Regions:
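Residues at secondary-structure transition points
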Residues: 30-38, 69, 73, 77, ...
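Phosphate/pyrophosphate-binding loops at sites that engage ATP/ADP/AMP, CoA/4′-phosphopantetheine
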Residues: 43-59
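Hydrophobic packing within well-folded, soluble alpha/beta domains
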Residues: 15, 39, 57-60, 82
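DPxDG-like acidic metal-binding loop motif
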Residues: 59-95
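Phosphate-handling active-site elements
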Residues: 50-55, 84-93, 109-111
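Oxyanion-binding and handling regions
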Residues: 1-24, 34-36, 91-200
């Protein structure tokens, strides 16, 4: 089983391959908001470096948001195009569940719930998961970090400084497939309106 994972929801882009044993190969582009121009260059570099091609990929995964409006659309469009050309199964994961997965790796013996929190310009995004990474709430956006409805309590764990990339999304899909957990179809997750829509 090998997974091609795509993450373009931040200012940079990353594409990763996760193999059957959980080994990760990742390529990044740190140039700000350069998703469209760099996507297939990153993908070709990844394939060339690690002797991969579409025939060696079994599953596709894309981070569907929340994050950059343009980045979300670029990642989803690219993933759907690859899915159409290769007929490989395609799954959507959100950045909060990817963060929850990385937190779970830091606290492997904990049975506490996991509160994923991602900061943004307006406040933060958040979602609650149990220790098996099953969602206990939907993803939400909050404008005030001190909001009581999203307070962090002692019965859950969190970590706000996870440095996420596409390999974490691929590893999450690897985990869910291995544990026979539900994987979602691709649907864009916009928790904030894009700036140009606010002026309409």
């Amino acid at each position: 089983m090998s997974i091609l994972a795509i993450d373009t929801v931040g200012t940079g882009s990353s594409i990763a391959i996760v193999d059957y044993d959980g080994n990760c190969f990742v390529e990044r582009n740190s140039a700000s908001n350069n998703h469209v121009e760099s996507f297939f260059q990153i993908l070709n570099t990844l394939f060339d470096k690690h002797n991969y091609n579409y025939d060696k990929i079994d599953h596709l995964a894309v981070v569907v948001g929340p994050g950059s409006f343009t980045g979300i659309r670029v990642g989803i469009s690219a993933a759907q195009g690859i899915n159409l050309a290769t007929n490989k199964p395609l799954y959507g994961v959100n950045a909060l569940e990817v963060q929850a997965y990385t937190i779970s790796l830091l606290c492997t013996n904990s049975k506490k719930n996991i509160r994923a929190i991602i900061k943004n310009a307006q406040g933060f995004y958040t979602q609650l998961f149990d220790f098996n990474l099953l969602p206990l709430s939907g993803p939400t956006a909050a404008r005030e970090p001190g909001s009581k409805c999203h307070a962090i309590s002692s019965d859950c764990i969190t970590h706000m400084d996870c440095n996420l990339n596409a390999s974490h999304a691929g590893l999450l899909v690897h985990y869910r497939l291995k544990n026979k957990q539900k994987l979602n179809e691709v649907e864009a997750l916009y928790l904030n309106e894009p700036q140009y829509m606010k002026s309409l």
